[in-house]
Amino acid sequence: MAQIFNFSSGPAMLPAEVLEQAQQELRDWNGLGTSVMEVSHRGKEFIQVAEEAEKDFRDLLNVPSNYKVLFCHGGGRGQFAAVPLNILGDKTTADYVDAGYWAASAIKEAKKYCTPNVFDAKVTVDGLRAVKPMSEWQLSDNAAYMHYCPNETIDGIAIDETPDFGKDVVVAADFSSTILSRPIDVSRYGVIYAGAQKNIGPAGLTIVIVREDLLGKANIACPSILDYSILNDNDSMFNTPPTFAWYLSGLVFKWLKANGGVAAMDKINQQKAELLYGVIDNSDFYRNDVAKANRSRMNVPFQLADSALDKLFLEESFAAGLHALKGHRVVGGMRASIYNAMPLEGVKALTDFMVEFERRHG
């Protein structure tokens, strides 16, 4: 079968080695004669999977011992509600930084539970979309926490700065599309959450990293399945977890460790982004409208000089084995999502196609 490179924003491409192992084990996992999807989540075999997955995840991100790691349902949108329900305590407001679509979605959900103090960080610099630096973010004195999204998949905007607002500011962040792609200092955050379907594994699993002193503050109306304390007390098994997603994510963690960990991913992701943005910047046929300081390394939106060629570009790229390049309806054009599992070879195939397409149609 011809090599297919999947540039989907999520569910996203998974490492070929991981898929091959899962395929081999699908009907006879661990010598049990059954699939991992069929075994009890409370059986010793799956407990081992769960424990190894958490340990490997902690190792990859150097998660400090005073942080809990939870494997949850509900996706990022579930956490839009879970964060205020768990962290507000007796306060009624929280700071929210708006830098794009997903930050705005979190703000909309938070309004059900508190009065968000919204800081619009979006700005235009030399005609390009950008984000104000953290030094200019205006935070309130009475907020329970500050929330932001480090990587906006739709807008192709990244905030790579490390938060430094002082020890009294609880920082909550949606790392769904950038987790494990580069080193992060977990100790600078109160809550980190990430849907699995981009850099972790298949859809259906969400990972939460929460500082232990923030547990035990959940609103009385918080659903039990979103209560961090309950999930922690039950080892993320308050109800039946998404076991297959948990298992497959564990395989991804082992793949990451075998390939040099997050530091190695950071380097290769930089190479991939530089290659793709280089073709865009050295062309009058393609353009990206994000300021270089805020360009995402995970999600690269770009437009053609003549939008009438969009349909042909998508048809020909698909035929060439370059799939899921259509941009989000909000932005249009094209978008290449190049998460950890996308090899440099895939980005090279895309850039070669782009150069050839421009030669024929530019």
Curated annotation (Swiss-Prot):
<feature type="binding site">
    <location>
        <position position="42"/>
    </location>
    <ligand>
        <name>L-glutamate</name>
    </ligand>
</feature>
<comment type="pathway">
    <text>Amino-acid biosynthesis; L-serine biosynthesis; L-serine from 3-phospho-D-glycerate: step 2/3.</text>
</comment>
<feature type="binding site">
    <location>
        <position position="174"/>
    </location>
    <ligand>
        <name>pyridoxal 5'-phosphate</name>
    </ligand>
</feature>
<comment type="subunit">
    <text>Homodimer.</text>
</comment>
<dbReference type="InterPro" id="IPR015422">
    <property type="entry name" value="PyrdxlP-dep_Trfase_small"/>
</dbReference>
<feature type="binding site">
    <location>
        <begin position="76"/>
        <end position="77"/>
    </location>
    <ligand>
        <name>pyridoxal 5'-phosphate</name>
    </ligand>
</feature>
<dbReference type="InterPro" id="IPR000192">
    <property type="entry name" value="Aminotrans_V_dom"/>
</dbReference>
<dbReference type="InterPro" id="IPR015421">
    <property type="entry name" value="PyrdxlP-dep_Trfase_major"/>
</dbReference>
<keyword id="KW-0663">Pyridoxal phosphate</keyword>
<dbReference type="GO" id="GO:0005737">
    <property type="term" value="C:cytoplasm"/>
</dbReference>
<keyword id="KW-0032">Aminotransferase</keyword>
<feature type="binding site">
    <location>
        <position position="9"/>
    </location>
    <ligand>
        <name>L-glutamate</name>
    </ligand>
</feature>
<dbReference type="GO" id="GO:0030170">
    <property type="term" value="F:pyridoxal phosphate binding"/>
</dbReference>
<dbReference type="GO" id="GO:0008615">
    <property type="term" value="P:pyridoxine biosynthetic process"/>
</dbReference>
<feature type="binding site">
    <location>
        <position position="102"/>
    </location>
    <ligand>
        <name>pyridoxal 5'-phosphate</name>
    </ligand>
</feature>
<protein>
    <recommendedName>
        <fullName>Phosphoserine aminotransferase</fullName>
        <ecNumber>2.6.1.52</ecNumber>
    </recommendedName>
</protein>
<feature type="binding site">
    <location>
        <begin position="239"/>
        <end position="240"/>
    </location>
    <ligand>
        <name>pyridoxal 5'-phosphate</name>
    </ligand>
</feature>
<dbReference type="InterPro" id="IPR022278">
    <property type="entry name" value="Pser_aminoTfrase"/>
</dbReference>
<feature type="modified residue" description="N6-(pyridoxal phosphate)lysine">
    <location>
        <position position="198"/>
    </location>
</feature>
<keyword id="KW-0808">Transferase</keyword>
<dbReference type="InterPro" id="IPR020578">
    <property type="entry name" value="Aminotrans_V_PyrdxlP_BS"/>
</dbReference>
<keyword id="KW-0664">Pyridoxine biosynthesis</keyword>
<keyword id="KW-0718">Serine biosynthesis</keyword>
<feature type="binding site">
    <location>
        <position position="197"/>
    </location>
    <ligand>
        <name>pyridoxal 5'-phosphate</name>
    </ligand>
</feature>
<comment type="function">
    <text>Catalyzes the reversible conversion of 3-phosphohydroxypyruvate to phosphoserine and of 3-hydroxy-2-oxo-4-phosphonooxybutanoate to phosphohydroxythreonine.</text>
</comment>
<comment type="similarity">
    <text>Belongs to the class-V pyridoxal-phosphate-dependent aminotransferase family. SerC subfamily.</text>
</comment>
<dbReference type="GO" id="GO:0006564">
    <property type="term" value="P:L-serine biosynthetic process"/>
</dbReference>
<keyword id="KW-0028">Amino-acid biosynthesis</keyword>
<keyword id="KW-0963">Cytoplasm</keyword>
<dbReference type="Pfam" id="PF00266">
    <property type="entry name" value="Aminotran_5"/>
</dbReference>
<dbReference type="GO" id="GO:0004648">
    <property type="term" value="F:O-phospho-L-serine:2-oxoglutarate aminotransferase activity"/>
</dbReference>
<comment type="pathway">
    <text>Cofactor biosynthesis; pyridoxine 5'-phosphate biosynthesis; pyridoxine 5'-phosphate from D-erythrose 4-phosphate: step 3/5.</text>
</comment>
<feature type="binding site">
    <location>
        <position position="153"/>
    </location>
    <ligand>
        <name>pyridoxal 5'-phosphate</name>
    </ligand>
</feature>
<dbReference type="InterPro" id="IPR015424">
    <property type="entry name" value="PyrdxlP-dep_Trfase"/>
</dbReference>
